[in-house]
Curated annotation (Swiss-Prot):
Coiled-coil segments on the chain, per record: none
Region (Disordered) location: 1-20
SUPFAM superfamilies reported in the protein's UniProt record: Restriction endonuclease-like
Name by which UniProt lists this protein: UPF0102 protein KPK_0567
Organism listed in the record: Klebsiella pneumoniae (strain 342)
Superkingdom classification of source: Bacteria
Single GO term (MF): nucleic acid binding
Family: Belongs to the UPF0102 family.
Pfam families, sorted: UPF0102
HAMAP family in UniProt: UPF0102
InterPro entries per UniProt: Restrct_endonuc-II-like (IPR011335), tRNA_endonuc-like_dom_sf (IPR011856), UPF0102_YraN-like (IPR003509)
Length: 128
């Protein structure tokens, strides 16, 4: 019988691995759409940004969501107002570290949602 290392949460590890795989797929898909990769899993106080991309001169903060099926709603619907606020805060802090702000940098918030085999790209899904 396999043992889970002390202090490790196996289901949490699997969730992280699954999330990383979908984020990588979203990155490749967005690059195929012409966006340029900047960063992944940018952690700031209060939140994490899955992907930061560039679409021309626009900085794009991307939230990636996955649901196996739409039984309880599609993946895009899981980006709650609370999650949006955390992403806005994280993006504001990330921009500040880059010597920018929402006032000086053209940016938007996109959601790439995988529900089963379907992909949905919601450009400018929310904002401040």
């Amino acid at each position: 019988m396999a043992q889970v290392p002390a202090g490790k949460n196996r289901s949490g590890q699997l969730s992280k691995q699954t999330g990383d795989a979908w984020e990588n797929q979203a990155r490749r898909w967005l690059e195929g759409q012409g966006l340029r990769f900047i960063a992944a899993n940018a952690r700031e106080r209060g939140g994490e940004i899955d992907l930061i991309m560039r679409d021309g001169a626009v900085t794009v903060f991307v939230e990636v969501r996955y649901r196996r099926s739409a039984r309880y709603g599609d993946a895009a619907a899981s980006v709650t107002p609370q999650k949006q606020q955390r992403l806005l805060k994280a993006a504001r802090l990330w921009l500040c570290r880059q010597n920018g702000s929402f006032e000086t940098v053209d940016c938007r918030f996109d959601v790439v949602a995988f529900t089963g085999n379907d992909i949905q790209w919601l450009k400018n899904a929310f904002g401040e």
